[in-house]
Amino acid sequence: MSPAVAAPDMDDIMAAEARLAGLALRTPLVRLNYPDTPAEIYLKLENLQPVGSFKIRSMGNILRSADPQKLRSGVYTASSGNSGYALAWLAQRMGIPATVYVPENAPAGKRALISHTGAQIKALPYADWWDVICNHSASGEQGLYIDAVCDPAAIAGNATIGLEILHDLPQVDTIVVPFGGGGVSCGIAAAVGLLKPGTRVLAAECEMSTPFTSARAAGQAVAVENRKSFISGIGASTVLPEMWPLVKRLLSGSVVSPLNAIADAIRILFECNRVVAEGAGATALAGALTVQASGPVVCVITGGNIDKAHMMAILRGGVPVAA
């Protein structure tokens, strides 16, 4: 098993902020324009990044801190969409080849985004794709594997979101973050823990797969059922063992939402704030609408790369079928 992942310190986070200058946007923090909320809710709009998600921070910091010689033969990753698109987008601009391994049921819209960069896409059965993530490598690949979850540079890049939240809303009480592998939630929690201890960071999960909630209940990483839905980007088979000590220490708890509540959150974001969010990103708002807090709550809207057909179905009041 790989060694446990360590949290970034303030030097790591500040270095990441400097590397990302001119690449990642300093995204706005806006008040949710919805009256029926248990607390003041604010939206951190990472869906406005050039690649449509926060992944430009993690992938950007990894690539900008990597040895250029190691990048010459190309880069590859395993992703359900957003990490792969961010890597492919960055690789195109750096003039290096990129390959993205996706699960066979990856959303068509996200595959199209990756393809438009010129990157190679390799679709695998879910179990084989998950093996690439767990092993941090793929058989036969000659390039550098880029890990958007466990790489310390990825977590430090994600931590810059926490810096921005505290700068814009120092009185924040709770931050709700979608939980995929734990890289973004732990990055934000690391920054917040250094600057404003006591601020809660909650993992937002969908009822279809609850790796963090289940691990927290069991006291260790456990395998969970991963039922398919229209949501991609969160809901893994387990918390990666090397991430478990970090997520256990940094995250205050979790909130689990049903599919219909997440579809409702997508609709609320669009109708009330004209924000386009994908299912994973809207999971933060779905969770926040049930959270009791003593002060303002921030939802990190991690991405907006939603399939058009899914968005149309939701705006008509439905819940899309699985991809």
Predicted regions and their residues:
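PLP-dependent amino-acid enzyme catalytic core
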Residues: M1-A323
